[in-house]
């Protein structure tokens, strides 16, 4: 984000704080935290530490290919756009009434990465069977030091402790999810090192995102119009063609790969003869791209519906008319 886009509206109110003896796993504590976070108030540093400790216990029990049941609503990138996350919940339904699967990239670029990721982690602990949060390529120590989350933590807390608590927690996020053994969900895309879901299950995910290899590819790769594997212009992961996604889906008994990671102007985009769908849930990305956002509702019969939404106008934040972006951010 450009420095000159930092505005008074992004500065945080006093953090919500509960007593040091409060159990971070208790329902009253979590409900208090969630209530505060829903008004875009950050938690106190010590509460974030205890929250992340509790979340690690929950996440380390989950699989690299986390099973998810229908009905569920699948969401793409959020990127710290907290008020647009509130709009997403308004459109899709509140927790725990709606089951949610988020496919990563909660932080960086938007004004409110701290509040966004804290709320999603709180909801995960409070309703562990109702919400699934996967790892994106921005849930990384290196990436967050460049694209905003690190600097936001310094600005809002005066030190890097909260950044460290969350980036340590990111190592425990599941890499992928599998809806009813049919719809495969992940942040980025496929890997030449991975032929089967069992290949993914055997990975050691508790680490910083590597610069190369299968774990990197799952978070960084993109579908492409060209067949086969290609070198990614991102500098990490690969591009993969329709032949690759068709073979992967066929070999693993899948009907669809759902992924995020790329800005699409209508919020969702089918590709590769409907073997792959891209979902992007940050409207007017970076407060200037003019795109719609979307979420994918999947009912108990595995029928899906896309709900598109625009950003909420907010005082103090720049607005743009919709336009085609000059490049993918």
Swiss-Prot record:
Mn(2+) 1 binds at residues 77, 79, 105. It is an enzyme of class 3 (hydrolase). It comes from the Eukaryota. SMART domains: PP2Ac. Keywords: Hydrolase, Manganese, Metal-binding, Methylation, Protein phosphatase. GO terms for biological process: mitotic cell cycle. GO terms for molecular function: metal ion binding; protein serine/threonine phosphatase activity. It catalyses: O-phospho-L-seryl-[protein] + H2O = L-seryl-[protein] + phosphate; O-phospho-L-threonyl-[protein] + H2O = L-threonyl-[protein] + phosphate. Mn(2+) 2 binds at residues 105, 137, 187, 261. It holds the Pfam family Metallophos. Residues 8-17 have a biased composition (Basic and acidic residues). InterPro entries: Calcineurin-like_PHP_ApaH, Metallo-depent_PP-like, PPA2-like, Ser/Thr-sp_prot-phosphatase. Its cofactor is Mn(2+). Residues 1-25 are annotated as: Disordered. This is Serine/threonine-protein phosphatase PP2A catalytic subunit.
């Amino acid at each position: 984000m450009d420095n000159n886009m930092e505005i008074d509206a992004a500065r945080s109110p006093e953090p919500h704080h509960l007593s040091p003896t409060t159990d971070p796993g208790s329902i009253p504590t979590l409900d208090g935290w969630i209530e505060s976070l829903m008004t875009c108030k950050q938690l106190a540093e010590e509460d974030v530490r205890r929250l992340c400790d509790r979340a690690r216990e929950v996440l380390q029990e989950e699989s690299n290919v986390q099973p998810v049941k229908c009905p569920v609503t699948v969401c793409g990138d959020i990127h710290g756009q907290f008020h647009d996350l509130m709009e997403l919940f308004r459109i899709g339904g509140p927790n725990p009434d709606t089951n949610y699967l988020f496919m990563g990239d909660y932080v960086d670029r938007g004004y409110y990465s701290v509040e966004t990721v804290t709320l999603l982690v709180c909801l995960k602990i409070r309703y562990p069977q109702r919400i699934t949060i996967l790892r994106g390529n921005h849930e990384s120590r290196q990436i967050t030091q460049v694209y905003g989350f690190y600097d936001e933590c310094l600005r809002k807390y005066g030190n890097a402790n909260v950044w460290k608590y969350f980036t340590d927690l990111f190592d425990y996020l599941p890499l992928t999810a599998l809806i009813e053994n049919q719809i495969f969900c992940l942040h980025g895309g496929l890997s030449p090192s991975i032929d089967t879901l069992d290949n993914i299950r055997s990975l050691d995910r508790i680490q910083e995102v590597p610069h190369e290899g299968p774990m990197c590819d799952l978070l960084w790769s993109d579908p492409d119009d060209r067949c086969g594997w290609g070198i990614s212009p991102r500098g990490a992961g690969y591009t993969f063609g329709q032949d690759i996604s068709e073979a992967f889906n066929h070999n693993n008994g899948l009907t669809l790969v759902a992924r995020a990671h790329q800005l699409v102007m209508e919020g969702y985009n089918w590709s590769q003869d409907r073997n792959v769908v891209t979902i992007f849930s940050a409207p007017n990305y970076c407060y200037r791209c003019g795109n719609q956002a979307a979420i994918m509702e999947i009912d108990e019969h595995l029928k899906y519906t896309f709900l598109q939404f625009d950003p909420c106008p907010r005082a103090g934040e720049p607005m743009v008319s919709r336009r085609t972006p000059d490049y993918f951010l």
